[in-house]
Amino acid sequence: MEHLLSMEHLSNSEIYDLITIACQFKSGERPLPQFNGQYVSNLFFENSTRTKCSFEMAEQKLGLKLINFETSTSSVKKGESLYDTCKTLESIGVDLLVIRHSQNSYYEELDQLNIPIANAGDGSGQHPTQSLLDIMTIYEEYGSFEGLNILICGDIKNSRVARSNYHSLTSLGANVMFSSPKEWVDNTLEAPYVEIDEVIDKVDIVMLLRVQHERHGISGEANFAAEEYHQQFGLTQARYDKLKEEAIVMHPAPVNRGVEIKSELVEAPKSRIFKQMENGMYLRMAVISALLQ
């Protein structure tokens, strides 16, 4: 695998290969490759806890040496372009770049680089490692994707997770549907929009999305009514109680407790939210291994 940029660039067989490797790392069946003497740099131009820290943990477990990069103290503050920043790191011997950026498809500007890129999120475009860890979590639960009914609720228009998961899960045979306020509908995605209360007792997976305040502008955030949103589109106790016995709840996090999901349900028996985070490290180990081997 040359790069990991978008779920649309991965075949189903490549997806299965990556989650199989990740599951084997997790179970201990597969010995960890050690990339001693190879260097990685994580370039995060947007805030991150889970993605950044799990990439760092994955890199350390694989023996990579981390070249620290902080946007606030870099020449980006002097106007250096993303390409020149990345080309500089390549020139000094970095072997892999992990990049999160607010610009959709930022990687299209980097096609002259000669080292692999792992996309850790581009604007509202794609978040392939999040999608892959979600797929891994679903696979551990169900063993397949064909015919699964998956409801994705929330800020569809601004969510790179919704976009990535829509493409990958439909390709794998799942039935994806959305529930969202009308102002956050994305008409470029062909999944049907439904009322959450009409399907909550029929779905296998409820995937909740964070409200993307940073992409709504000041007026959008000021006019947001958290309790009203929670009652209309969030996972309330009443909705949780209607879920099928074997259904699971997912969220890419960070979670706005009491908005997308009732706080007490974040760690309820059907929740796999922290399992997603655990799987993220193993999945990113699999991605790094595929990019460097």
Curated annotation (Swiss-Prot):
Pathway named in the protein's UniProt entry = Pyrimidine metabolism; UMP biosynthesis via de novo pathway; (S)-dihydroorotate from bicarbonate: step 2/3
Provide the reaction this enzyme catalyses: carbamoyl phosphate + L-aspartate = N-carbamoyl-L-aspartate + phosphate + H(+)
- What's one GO MF term for it? amino acid binding
* One GO term (biological process): 'de novo' pyrimidine nucleobase biosynthetic process
Per UniProt, where does carbamoyl phosphate bind? Answer: 50-51, 100, 127, 130, 253-254
Q: Where does L-aspartate bind?
A: 78, 160, 210
Q: What class of enzyme is it?
A: transferase
Q: Which UniProt keywords apply?
A: Pyrimidine biosynthesis, Transferase
Entry-linked NCBIfam families: asp_carb_tr, PRK00856.1
Q: What does this protein do?
A: Catalyzes the condensation of carbamoyl phosphate and aspartate to form carbamoyl aspartate and inorganic phosphate, the committed step in the de novo pyrimidine nucleotide biosynthesis pathway.
- The protein, known as: Aspartate carbamoyltransferase catalytic subunit
Organism, per UniProt?
Staphylococcus epidermidis (strain ATCC 12228 / FDA PCI 1200)
